[in-house]
């Protein structure tokens, strides 16, 4: 049970985050376009990307290279511009070939490369100090696959920074039409991934400090939206993530005082340890606010703190505000864009039943999306903006464990 949710990508869902496969060809006359729900907040959303190079750190996955990352910054805009791609084109190409395997459809059935987000590329910044939220994706999953919740937060006045963890994810596109694909050392590599993610996120925080001071941390010093650094309120930073990204967010909450609150979306906290009690994050706990959001049964029971020992120990060792929310009929990928994408694909072709069961389960998709777009902003509103939320009444398809 210990790592089943973090490593699910390597099992039933592996092709959705897989490497490029040989012999790909497409004879699809009219590819299916991606359609995602629009954000509901009052602000248009803008986005830009940055290439970050950590000159102080060698890459643990590829010796002899400095660690480099790609991040996206989503922010409240004053007006919408031409929409940014859903995924960078080279990333979309790699991801699409893997997705075709999982969906049992020819490559090209879905137009991943042409898909658009709901954010304007380099849109003008809406002035005003904004709380900042980091997002870390699951193991092997591109940062763009959480666009629904990310755009929702940005439309409600947050600056959201999404991070690709290079060489762990299926493919990361860098400037100059360069892509770095998944490059993992021989197993076991769980501890390496955990410590690397933690260092990645701390480096991103340092880079945001540079940006707020007026510097441009992009390695190529590409143009950024005017005034982007001026809206970063680095005294109000939260973090959230899915699967391994949820673990990374809680690691950061416990160890880095810059993080004031965090959400873990279905990520077990004992990753890399035979006994979850040995994980420093679990053993230490926190006095800062956190929200656990777990899925339904994959194994002995639902993912909640009474069932998952790593969640239970962390819960017992933590003394601050805490909530445990479960989606009983959802599954591990109900917390990211698959919850909307898979029902959309079902309109055009048959999606394998096993894939549905292992990714989003049987929960009503619209209700799960409603819950995600309610509880994530509500949590950060309460703890970064001092806007209380009533946590006593669960929405449909959700259950409060504690």
Q: Residue locations for each model-derived region?
A:
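Domain-level recognition of soluble alpha/beta enzyme cores
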Residues: 27-132, 354-365
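Short substrate-entry loop that stabilizes the transition state in hydrolases
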Residues: 125-130, 139-171
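Alpha/beta-hydrolase active-site loop
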Residues: 181-230
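Gly/Ala-rich beta-loop-alpha elbow adjacent to hydrolase catalytic centers
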Residues: 241-245
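Short glycine-enriched nucleophile-adjacent loop
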Residues: 246-255
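The feature captures the conserved acid-bearing segment of alpha/beta-hydrolase catalytic domains
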Residues: 261-332
């Amino acid at each position: 049970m210990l790592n089943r949710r973090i490593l699910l990508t390597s099992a039933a869902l592996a092709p959705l985050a897989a490497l490029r496969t040989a012999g790909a060809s497409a004879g699809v006359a009219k590819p299916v376009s991606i359609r995602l729900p629009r954000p509901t907040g009052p602000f248009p959303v803008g986005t830009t990307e940055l290439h970050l190079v950590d000159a102080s750190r060698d890459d643990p996955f590829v010796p002899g290279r400095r660690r480099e990352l790609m991040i996206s910054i989503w922010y409240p805009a004053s007006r919408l511009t031409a929409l940014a791609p859903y995924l960078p084109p080279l990333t979309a190409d790699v991801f699409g070939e893997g997705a075709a395997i999982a969906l049992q459809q020819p490559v090209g059935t879905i137009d991943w490369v042409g898909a658009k987000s709901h954010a304007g590329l380099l849109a003008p910044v809406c002035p005003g100090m904004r709380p900042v939220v980091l997002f870390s994706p699951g193991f092997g999953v591109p940062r763009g696959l959480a666009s629904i919740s990310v755009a929702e937060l940005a439309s409600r006045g947050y600056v959201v920074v999404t991070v690709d963890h290079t060489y762990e994810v299926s493919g990361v596109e860098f400037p100059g039409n360069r892509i770095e694909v998944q490059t993992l050392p021989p197993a076991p590599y769980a501890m390496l991934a955990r410590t690397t993610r933690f260092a990645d996120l701390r480096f991103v925080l340092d880079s945001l400090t540079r940006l707020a001071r007026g510097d441009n941390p992009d390695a190529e010093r590409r143009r950024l939206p005017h005034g982007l650094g001026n809206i970063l309120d680095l005294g109000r930073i939260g973090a959230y993530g899915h699967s391994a990204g949820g673990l990374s967010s809680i690691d950061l909450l416990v160890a880095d005082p810059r993080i004031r609150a965090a959400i873990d979306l279905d990520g077990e906290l004992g990753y890399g340890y035979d006994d979850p009690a040995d994980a420093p994050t679990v053993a230490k706990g926190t006095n800062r606010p956190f929200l656990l959001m777990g899925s339904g049964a994959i194994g002995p029971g639902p993912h909640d703190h009474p069932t998952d020992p790593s969640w239970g120990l962390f819960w017992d060792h933590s003394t601050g505000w805490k909530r445990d929310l479960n989606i009983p009929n959802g599954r591990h990928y109900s917390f990211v864009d698959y919850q909307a994408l898979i029902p959309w694909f079902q309109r055009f072709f048959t999606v394998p039943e096993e894939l549905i069961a292992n990714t989003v389960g049987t929960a009503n998709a619209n209700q799960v999306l409603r819950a995600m777009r309610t509880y994530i902003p509500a949590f950060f509103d309460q703890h970064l903006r001092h806007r209380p939320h009533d946590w006593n009444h669960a929405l449909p398809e959700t259950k409060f464990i504690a």
